Amino acid sequence: MLFRSVVFEDYNDMSARIDRDDLDVDANSVLVLKNAGPLGGPGFPEWGMLPMPKKLIKQGVKDMVRISDGRMSGTSYGTCILHVAPEAYVGGPLALVKTGDLIELDAEKKLLNLKISAEELEKRKKAWKRPPLKYERSYGAIFSRHVKQANEGCDFDFLEGTAPTSDPEIH
């Protein structure tokens, strides 16, 4: 299926616009929340459960596709693609998505594609600029410089060992 994307640059952008009457969204849109991952949040907050726009709820829409580099509680519901990694904050795939882009989703084939030309994709990659780190000192600075991405466990890189860790004995 093809979905037209409605992109939110971060949680504050989403919070400010999700229920506006002029939000260009319909039941066949996909909501995309960027910069909600380990660094973008920061801290990998549970922002992946994007709320349904009120104007769609009033129309009887109960679910829609939502994509984020964030996470959500296990008690949440709906059609969500989460933990997209690398996250947008470090230039991952969501960093290049813009409102109006078509996104192809086929769950059975495990397929998620941004339907733009290779030339446009390359142009966006070249234009992308990494945001500055949110912290310059203290724990926030250590976190920002050393946390790994979601697909790598969000651990600190300096805590990696050189040998595999065996599973604990269970009695």
Please report, for each region that a protein language model flagged, where it lies by residue.
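Glycine-rich phosphate/diphosphate-binding loops that line cofactor/substrate pockets in enzymes
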Residues: 17-30
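Intein/HINT protein-splicing elements and their conserved insertion hotspots or analogous self-processing inserts
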Residues: 91-92, 96-171
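Charged helix-capping and loop-helix junction motifs
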Residues: 46-52
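Short, small-residue-biased leader/transition segments that mark boundaries at the very start
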Residues: 1-2
